[in-house]
Design a protein with these regions (language model features):
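Solvent-exposed alpha-helices and their adjacent loops that cap or buttress functional pockets
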Residues: 22-23, 41-45, 66-69, 101-104, ...
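General beta-strand structural signal in soluble alpha/beta enzymes
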Residues: 30-32, 53, 76, 110-113, ...
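Short hydrophobic/aromatic beta-strand micro-patches
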Residues: 154-158
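Intein/HINT protein-splicing elements and their conserved insertion hotspots or analogous self-processing inserts
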Residues: 11-13, 28, 34-149, 159-238, ...
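A glycine- and small-aliphatic-rich helix-loop capping segment at beta-alpha/alpha-beta transitions
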Residues: 8-12, 45, 128-131, 310-319, ...
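Thiamine diphosphate
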Residues: 1-21, 33, 97, 322-327
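Amide-donor transfer/coupling interface in amidating biosynthetic enzymes
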Residues: 172, 278-279, 283-284, 325-328, ...
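N-terminal beta1-alpha1 cap of cysteine-dependent amidohydrolase-like domains
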Residues: 184-340, 344-355, 369-377, 442, ...
Length: 500
């Protein structure tokens, strides 16, 4: 650990500043960690303070930063500062209170908190989201465009409502339809500005692989009237959600099923010792016997070790007790099975998709492998319903397109061409990644993992087992409010209705 007082003075001064802000705003701090003591021999930890701030608000009061509509005005809320350029906290609290009033009344529709990069960076980032342009007026001094302005806010205001604002503001420009950033005679195409911003670290953290392609995928849709009908009706079906070490989507999955009207049984697979494992197998077997559906949730079971995703998941369900219980649910009780993300990986490894039964994998078996970019991806993808074979999609139509979150490191669907063609012919290709025109594509902006034939989800031969990468369970009324498009595939409602 270094004894250099200058190195220690930097985080110390930052902590004093953070403490002053806490006192000024009347806010508490929760915990802290000293990592500078990690400096050892040739390992050097630079003097750094990292702060995370969390607030609570009503869902309907949340706004997002991207520009919404051409013609809307841009205003600059400047906080009051003292002779040392520090916030006058009482005045700032009053300004922020009025700012919240303007949000609640619907006058302010987007906003961005300024930082060390100033107005130009803030307006640019606001423009990138919806590819709306922005014109900044000359009343903004060019020296202020890139000057730090901590605490200030740039807000987008509904056209015609600027004069009704409760906040004290300076009007600085407007939103334009043309995707251009303009200041006086200077005009920069939005695409060029975004490339300059995101391209800085492209060589270090690539956003596209060398194999990225704009190649289109042959369109093959499957419509059938021969959809499996349940012969074991029940008023309120039960779903069993097994939880393994590393699973992290069980709460979202349970909430989605409960909202759809199902009973939920959740059990954790304990593996501290042999007795725990035997007990967990018995509990899982009993839960499957009580359920009409089983859902394998997303996450990183066993940390995706050893050497691959969902191996722990699949190994557990190859236990004879669990194997027989699952096949009894499917074969004798007309049950359903669903796997999302890590759960899809488990279904693939078990053979439940595409075979519809637990079997050993062979050289012709499809698999889900590392994303083409070689790392984890997390974004919203557009997926299209390619087949109506599955009861899980009874409430949607072939060719419907949805905006679905994806988050995985191994989601690239790979199989031999003859296997894929057979899946299409049987209607087992359930969903595909598509571009803005609704066409399946190999472009990584839309097919983020590089799946063959843009395949996002497949089913068993009769459609009762569905595996997909996209997290349909994460949909909620106020989740992703700035993401456009249909988000609810009604998978969970369809699963429940299948038994009624």
């Amino acid at each position: 650990m270094t004894e250099d007082p200058k190195r220690w003075s930097q985080p110390f001064a930052a902590l004093l500043g953070a403490y002053a802000a806490q006192i000024g705003f009347g806010l508490p701090s929760i915990g802290g960690k000293d990592s500078m003591s990690g400096t050892f021999q040739d390992i050097d930890v630079p003097p750094t303070l990292v702060s995370f701030a969390v607030d609570m608000a009503l869902e309907q009061d949340i706004i997002t930063p991207e520009l919404k509509k051409a013609g809307n005005k841009l205003v600059w809320l400047k906080i009051e500062r003292d002779e040392n350029d520090l916030p006058v906290y009482d005045a700032v609290m009053d300004q922020y209170g009025k700012f919240m009033e303007d949000i609640q009344s619907g006058k302010i529709v987007s906003a961005y908190a300024l930082d060390r990069h100033g107005v130009a960076a803030a307006v640019s980032k606001m423009a990138f989201g919806n590819r709306k342009g922005a014109k900044i007026e000359h009343n903004v001094d060019k020296r202020d465009l890139f000057a730090p302005a901590f605490g200030d806010i740039i807000a987008e205001v509904e056209d015609g409502k600027v004069g009704e604002l409760a906040i004290t503001y300076t009007e600085i420009g407007e939103v334009t339809e043309e995707p251009v950033l303009a200041y006086g005679d200077v005009k920069i195409a939005l695409a060029d500005a975004q490339d300059a911003w995101t391209g800085t670290l492209e060589k270090v953290f690539a956003t596209k692989s060398a194999a990225d392609s704009d190649a289109k995928v042959e369109e093959k849709l499957f419509n059938t009237s021969d959809i499996h009908i349940c012969s074991h009706k029940i008023g309120q079906p039960t779903v069993f959600i097994p939880v393994f070490p590393g699973t992290n989507c069980e709460y979202d999955s349970a909430r989605a099923f409960e909202r759809a009207g199902a009973k939920v049984i959740t059990k954790v697979f304990r593996n501290l010792d042999a007795e725990d494992i035997r007990g967990s197998v018995d509990e899982f077997e009993k839960a499957i016997g009580q359920a009409q559906m089983i859902m394998f949730p997303g996450g990183f079971s066993a940390g995706d070790e050893p050497d691959g995703s969902a191996k722990f998941f699949a190994t557990a369900f190859r236990n004879e007790k669990l194997k027989e219980a699952v096949m009894d649910l499917l074969n004798n009780r007309d049950g359903l099975a669903l796997g999302i993300c890590n759960g899809f990986q488990a279904l693939i490894k078990l053979g439940l998709v595409p075979e519809g039964k637990i079997v050993e994998q062979n050289a012709k078996s499809p698999t889900l492998t590392t994303n083409r970019i070689g790392r984890h991806i997390s974004k919203v993808a557009y997926t299209r319903i390619a087949s109506n074979l599955s009861p899980w999609f009874n409430n949607v139509h072939v060719d419907d397109i949805f905006s679905i979150p994806v988050s995985h490191g191994e989601g690239r669907f790979v199989a031999d061409e003859d296997v894929i063609q057979k899946l299409f012919e049987n209607g087992q290709v359930a969903t595909q990644y598509v571009d803005l025109n609704g066409d399946p594509t190999m472009n990584e902006e839309f097919n983020p993992n590089g799946s063959y034939h843009a395949i996002e989800g497949i089913t068993s031969p009769d459609g009762r087992v569905l595996g997909k990468m996209g997290h349909s369970e994460r949909r909620d009324s106020y989740v992703g409010i700035n993401i456009y498009g249909q988000k609810d595939q009604k998978i969970f409602e369809s699963g429940v209705e299948y038994f009624k």
